Curated annotation (Swiss-Prot):
Residues 1114-1124 have a biased composition (Basic residues). Induction: Up-regulated by P.aeruginosa, PAO1 strain and PA14 strain infection. It comes from the Eukaryota. This is Metabotropic glutamate receptor-like protein Q. The gene is grlQ. It holds the Pfam family Beta_helix.
Amino acid sequence: MRLFFKFFYLSNEGFDNELCGNFKSPCKNIGYLFNNSRVDKNFNSTFYFSPGIYNLSSSIIIIDFQVGINLIGIGENKKIIITTHKGTRGVISYNSNLIIRGITFDNCKVKKNEFPLYVPETLTDYSDDKLDYLTLNYYIGTGGALQIVYSKVYISNCVFSNNKGRNGGAIFTVLSNITISDCIFYSNQALMRSEDGGNGGAIFFGLSTNAIILKSIFKNNMAITGGVIVQSNSELRVEDTVFAYNQASNGGVFLIFNDSKIESTRCSFYANYANISAIANIQNSFAFQKSCLYQENMASAMGGVFSLVDRTILFVTLSIFNDNYAPSSLIVENHGSGLAMFTNCEFTFSDNFKRQIIQSLFSISNYNFLLLKDSRVSNSKGNVIWCTSNAIIVVYNTTFYNVSSKVINIHSQGYFFSISTTFIECKAEDYLVVLRNGARGILFRNNFIDNNGILMVFTTYNSSMIIIESKFFNNIVRNELIAVRNEYTLQIYNSIFKNNIGKTRGCIISVDQLGKLTSTNNYFINNTSVYGTIINFVKKRFNYWHTDFQCFSTFKNDTIVNNTALVSGAIVYYRDKIIGTKYTCESCLFLNNIAHFGNNINSGFHSFSVIQASKVHSNEHFPALIYAFDQFDNLIRGKNDIRFHVSSCDDIHLTGVTSSTIQLNGVTALYNLKVNSPENHFCNLSYKSNPKKGDVKLPISILNCPQGEEMFDVSYQGKVFQCLKTIETSNIAKTVMIITTSILVLLILLCFGITIAYSKEKVINFGNIVFLILMLFSCLFLCIIIYVSIEPTNFSCQFSAIVFPIGIGILFTLTLLKQYKIYKLFKYSDFLKINTDNLKMVKYAGLIMVPVFLLVLIGVIVYPSKPTFILDLHTKTATKYCISRKYYVFSIVIVVYEVIILLTSCFIAMKSKRYHSTPGTFYESLFNSILIYNYTLVFIVLIPLFYTLQNNPTTIYLIYSIGSSILVFATLSIIFIPKINFLFRRKQIVSTLKKTIETQERDIQRNKDLLIFYKMFLIEKKNNNFNNNPIFNIHETFSSEDEDEDEEDDIGEGIYSLFNHWDQNKRKYNNNQIYPNQIPKQTTNSPSSQSIDFLNNPTIPKNKSINNLPNLFKKPKKKLKSKIISKSANSSPNINNNTINNNNNNNNNNNNNNNNNNNNNNINNNNNNNININTKRRKSMDPSLDS
């Protein structure tokens, strides 16, 4: 056939006329040439476009130009731009041959057809369905730049940008052959949302289209489905093409359906996006991908790269998948029933790839087939293969490296075949291979090396796994390498397990005895676990499939060497009871397998026994030893997860350490157990364990308390009974105090008898017999307390609480009144009326004791003291005390009150100190003061002891007893013993006093002579006009106090006054005058018949006259200085020891006169030397008698 060619030139600067179209005179509009019949269909016409923008007002319509139409751009394609008015398509090719080269189609947008539908006659043999598909579904508004129907089109070096169409934003083809080479498709769109629109953002390859795309770029194209290309019943071959940043709702790059075919070679897919299928959504079609790169493509729902539906076949080889993402499936979402095969592919994820939700790389949810061969998956963070159907999955010679989740996860009755697969350095947070719900799996010559995770292989729910000639080296698992559950079938042949570690349970195999386990010709070497290094039989679970399923296990020709269990079960460990037969291995080699706390075969906790005492005292400590055993009667050693608890029956209260955890040695103890119940009770203690393994009940009975102990309820809430040793007052203390008190009682009675018998004696009468009797009765009451307080009873507690404070109060009160009366009488010089009126004394004592009586009465009535046992559980003793809840408050008030009485007494005693040795008082003031001081000292010591030492009955009794005894003894020894001594040793006392006085007189006379001589010497010196001579005032009584008060005086005045005083006494004596003490004269002159209280007045001897004295002793003519010589230290009258001496000497003189002794000179001299010479004070004084 002969071809004819025509050439036309077009330019924006050209003119449309009959002569245009040549190089020198180009036409402006290509439509002018077609509309004016200048283009002959029998010629191959070529249109050359000069650089410029050609804005078409109507489409370039090419119909039946089978010889050929060529649209050629001159120069750069970017400078030759064909665009159209809004709503106008660029080129329409019907039944033609078209070549387009070097032209840019920009912003061509079509909404409807401008030309009636052309259906070639050759289509009349098509079925009505296809004609309907062609004319109605995809024809209207398609192909913004090109619409190609039943044509052959070759496009090269063109740019399609910003074009829009209902289907096929740039190109739409039907029944055509199209080749696209070296083109760029940029920002084309198919987004019309009317029915059946929005398909193929760049190209729509429709019915019976054969397309080839070479070395092109598709970027930023957009559609509802098929962001770049939609294929429907067409074939496409793509080579060396780049697809980047395209997006769609479904199929970010391709939407391939309706028996289409696509073959992609050396293509790159980068950062494409879709909701479903970031690259291709393939439905009922065939896709072949070779040597392609898929990087960072993303689907928001599923199918990060591919989605397969219906009978689709996908074959991918020699391709790389890097950082693609979809939450459901990063690579393939397969809902079809076809095949998906990946060979020699690499699936990688960079360190920067961080997504929160990753389900899997391959998701299979229908009956289909997946082949992963000669590939590598690395750094995956999700499941690699997820299957929820009965699909067939084959993994051959593939490596899984650093996978952090499951590699195979089959949830239904699928089939998994792994051949020559390697799992290396996977750090799975879960399992690597999982088969569930009847799935079947075979691992043939697989390698598990340096992996770390929970498990490597897991099958459950009637699933089966066969492992043949596989190797498990250097893996670390939390549980075991292989775990099978619930009617499983696990068969392991000719495999090696070496240097694996199980961190928490077993190491190699974990089974639940509800399946079939076969191990033949395997090697288990240097593996380590906690329990059951080789096989760990865990607790059985519910049988989901058959209730009569039995376990069958076969172990044959295995080699088990150098395996270690950190706790127990170096080879086998049963966590639950044995259901089937025990582990036995035929023709197996066991060598150097070690369990640190067990044997080669052990089981978990199976039973326990308890050792406890069968008879104890109530609330007595006793231990219970518990031993835990496994099913092989070995102690459960090395565990601490078994807890035991003991409980008692209702009528016995149990305390102590009632719960405990098993120790590493398999034994635990419940320490300090105590059962509390009255005597002779019986109970069964129930011991329980957790995990529960049946109760152990042991009888225990409550014994009677041993001798010397009693049963007490030691709890504030009751029901806690304990035998305690009763602490009583020491027998030695009782004996000693009873003897001591008895002696004191005898002394009291003796004193009482003597007081009554000698009541008229002055020494008794002077002390006030009522006072003495009351004191004796108070002492007797205190002694009675000692007898009564031996044993705490209701009476003794009340009696002691009443009598003790009242008794010591009476003693303190009487001594206070006595001392006060003595002080008052001497202070007002009424000392001669020393006897206190009895009625007044009783009255005053009663008034002082009223507060004590009231406080004791109120305290005893409101808070009565009762005997109560005080329990000390630390020492296991019970001590009986007299206790009142708040009586101590009243007792403190009473103590304070009585301390006030004592302090007042002490104060008065200190004020009365100068009256202690007053003559004629029998030293009542002195002895009473001493008694007060003793009372105070004893009471101050007794009170703190009484309130602090309350923890022992012996101590309390001794405080009462010794305190009372000391008070009684002090009273008797200070008040009564001196009087009794005076009554029965009167002569001896008088004789002793006489000798003492005579000795004192001689000493005084000698000293006085020396002083007078010295005085005379000084006077003589003074008369000789010596200057600065010391002048001494010599007091004739030699009182230190007088020396301090006297002024310097002349010695002559002193001597004159002395003899003048003697003369006055002489006259009084001769006239039978008696001193104011009104002591009657004695009728006899015998010393023995005279009372010790009677003292004669001193006299001046008659044979001595004052006139006969030397001049030195005469009264000087000058007037005497008035002065106060001395104040007595004892009383207001000037009565002192010198006076006593003088009186005694006078008595001696009288006796000597009656016996006609001539010793008057000596007597007078003695009297002269010992008489006080204070004349002024003497006039107001009366002599007193001294005892």
